């Protein structure tokens, strides 16, 4: 039973949906992003998605791409991202952390080394957007053997023939990408998302969390209402990009979390 499993079990008992927040590690700098990260649980965040900056983030829209560039220019590395998690864990042993990014930095570090470090740091799960199920032996299976959840993306174009393959070795939760395209590009609509979530729920017992295109507390409430929870990323990263004070960023996160929890 992982921290992710425990969190969903607790939320179900409370009759609440999950609010997942994404931030980019090291954006705009290590200190600020760590301060934001430490404040997320107090703002109502149930699960933290921590972006690993990468030079070629093909699935990310301009907001998150630019955040990754800022982080890399500020000296953020995979080692520093792991150090961020270790520091966070000194004050929080219960909030799940999912690292999200691309395979290249993990491969460069060495899968076995990375997984050992991730486990030691207190990482609970991975989302690696450019590793399809056909390559599960690369990272997915070793990650699960190391006790980490491996979370997969399902999209509007994941048809019923493809879906069993996507779900086969998925654990923790399923991340449903509500719109086709890059992050932050359009607004998700609950009326469109609901039947897709139902299709996923018919195929898996895992929680289904919806992300991409959620920018307001009202949207968080509406989308979480037809799923097991929602993810907000670009809307939070945009506040950091605008140089808003950490307290203001966290106030906005709290409003988004309250929206999801009102579903």
Swiss-Prot record:
GO terms for cellular component: cytosol. InterPro entries: Aldolase_TIM (IPR013785), RibuloseP-bd_barrel (IPR011060), Trp_synthase_alpha_AS (IPR018204), Trp_synthase_suA (IPR002028). Its EC number is 4.2.1.20. Pathway: Amino-acid biosynthesis; L-tryptophan biosynthesis; L-tryptophan from chorismate: step 5/5. Keywords: Amino-acid biosynthesis, Aromatic amino acid biosynthesis, Lyase, Tryptophan biosynthesis. One of its GO terms (molecular function) is tryptophan synthase activity. This is Tryptophan synthase alpha chain.
């Amino acid at each position: 039973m992982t921290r992710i499993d425990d969190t969903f079990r607790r939320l179900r008992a409370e009759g609440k949906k999950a609010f997942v927040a994404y931030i980019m590690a090291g954006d705009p700098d290590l200190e600020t992003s760590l301060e934001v990260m430490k404040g997320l649980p107090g703002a109502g965040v149930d699960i933290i998605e921590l972006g690993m900056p990468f030079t070629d983030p093909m699935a990310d829209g301009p907001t998150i791409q630019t955040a990754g560039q800022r982080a890399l220019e500020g000296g953020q590395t995979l080692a520093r991202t792991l150090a961020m998690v270790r520091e966070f864990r000194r004050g929080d042993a219960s909030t799940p952390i999912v690292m999200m990014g691309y395979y290249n930095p993990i491969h460069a570090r060495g899968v076995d080394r990375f997984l050992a470090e991730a486990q030691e740091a207190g990482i609970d799960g991975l989302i690696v957007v450019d590793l399809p199920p056909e390559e599960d032996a690369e990272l997915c299976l070793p990650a699960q053997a190391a006790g980490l959840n491996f979370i997969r993306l399902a999209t509007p174009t994941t048809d019923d023939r493809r879906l069993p393959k996507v779900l086969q070795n998925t654990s923790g939760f399923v991340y449903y990408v509500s719109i086709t395209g890059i992050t932050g590009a359009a607004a998700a609509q609950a009326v469109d998302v609901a039947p897709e979530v139902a299709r996923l729920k018919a195929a898996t017992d895992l929680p289904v969390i919806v992300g991409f295109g959620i920018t307001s507390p009202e949207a968080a409430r509406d989308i979480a209402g037809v799923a097991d929870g929602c993810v907000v990323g670009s809307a939070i990263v945009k506040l950091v990009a605008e140089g808003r004070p950490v307290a203001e960023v966290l106030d906005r996160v709290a409003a988004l979390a309250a929206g999801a929890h009102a579903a």
